[in-house]
From Swiss-Prot:
Repeat (ARM) residue spans along the chain: 13-55, 117-158, 161-199, 204-244
Name this protein carries in UniProt: Hsp70 nucleotide exchange factor FES1
GO terms assigned for molecular function: adenyl-nucleotide exchange factor activity
Gene of this entry: FES1
Known function: Functions as a nucleotide exchange factor (NEF) for Hsp70 chaperones which accelerates the release of ADP. Required for fully efficient Hsp70-mediated folding of proteins.
Family statement: Belongs to the FES1 family.
Gene Ontology cellular component annotations, sorted alphabetically: cytosol; endoplasmic reticulum
InterPro entries for this protein: ARM-like, ARM-type_fold, Hsp70_NEF-Inhibitors, Nucleotide_exch_fac_Fes1
Source organism: Debaryomyces hansenii (strain ATCC 36239 / CBS 767 / BCRC 21394 / JCM 1990 / NBRC 0083 / IGC 2968)
One GO BP annotation of this record: regulation of translation
Localization per Swiss-Prot or TrEMBL: Cytoplasm
């Protein structure tokens, strides 16, 4: 408050040196002082518009865009649960909802839970993970919606054992699908999901999934000299993660990894040196 008073006096006197020295006041403090709505109130207002089916789709999209910007702040992300807005967000993931709003809902979920243990726990109180998995398994799902849903799932389960356990319980592994002709953006999201899966301890049950889904073979298939650099980098990182978790590669897998490394030898200057060398240790 003292800083705000000093700023006000400097503004009135026109003392530029003092203004520069004091700096700008906290916008939140200005809002409180002059009676502007606080951010939780703005979040509630946005959700009211989003929930209103009589509002135009454009206005609902604008409201969701505003809501998304607000929850990029971690305090506001945590306030989604505090002011009981999660269910409204998750409801917009349903197949009956316009696609653009579903995209926003999945995106907001991913942003809110990313690197945020409290929001990860809060989100799991609802059926949002089941909705996200369902989106990824829809036939002819729009690519943008699938990307946002994969992002949200990855953000939810990364470094969060309880989140992974729920993912496993809901047959989340069903979304880990590799298609050689897939858009590289989708491949990157799936690889990020695999990385998130491996961010928690590799127990026997998880190892069984790795074998059943032929995960190692699918990852190795990405190591191509004409492949997308980002995907190759991520694939190497995942093999490195598996090695760090003391995963036992079969002799045929080790041979295929060695072949993959030869394939991308000329790309060494464009990919992570640490991951490349770590993977080389697997075959030596």
């Amino acid at each position: 408050m003292d800083k705000l008073l000093q700023w006000s006096i400097a503004q009135q006197s026109g003392d530029q040196e003092a203004i520069e020295k004091i700096g700008k006041p906290d916008p939140k403090m200005l809002e409180q002082l002059f009676g502007g709505p606080d951010e939780p109130a703005l979040m509630k207002q946005a959700i009211m518009v989003i929930d209103n089916e009589e509002a135009t789709l454009e206005n609902r999209e604008i409201a969701f865009d505003n809501f998304e910007m607000l929850i990029e702040n971690m305090d506001n992300a945590n306030n989604i649960e505090n002011i009981k807005l999660w269910q409204s967000v998750i409801d917009k993931m349903s197949a009956e909802t316009p696609t653009s709003l579903r995209v926003y809902a999945a995106s907001c979920a991913g942003i809110a839970v990313q690197n945020n243990p409290k929001s990860q726990e809060d989100f799991l109180k609802y059926d949002g993970l089941a909705s996200l998995i369902s989106i990824c398994n829809e036939e002819d799902v729009p690519t943008e919606l699938r990307l946002k849903a994969l992002f949200a799932i990855s953000s939810l389960i990364r470094n969060f054992e309880v989140g992974y356990a729920k993912f496993d319980e809901l047959d989340g592994w069903s979304v880990v699908k590799f298609n050689e002709n897939e858009d590289h953006k989708v491949k990157l999201r799936i690889l990020s999901l695999v990385s998130a899966i491996l961010s928690t301890p590799l127990d026997k049950k998880k190892e069984e999934h790795v074998h059943r889904e032929k995960l190692v073979a699918n990852i190795i298939s990405i190591l191509k000299k004409d492949g997308h650099i980002g995907c190759i980098d991520k694939a190497l990182n995942i093999i490195s993660q598996l090695a760090s978790s003391e995963f036992e590669f079969s002799s045929s897998e080790i041979g295929d990894i060695a072949q993959g490394l030869e394939e991308i030898e000329k790309l060494k200057d464009s990919i992570s040196e640490d991951d490349y060398n770590s993977v080389k240790q697997v075959v030596n």
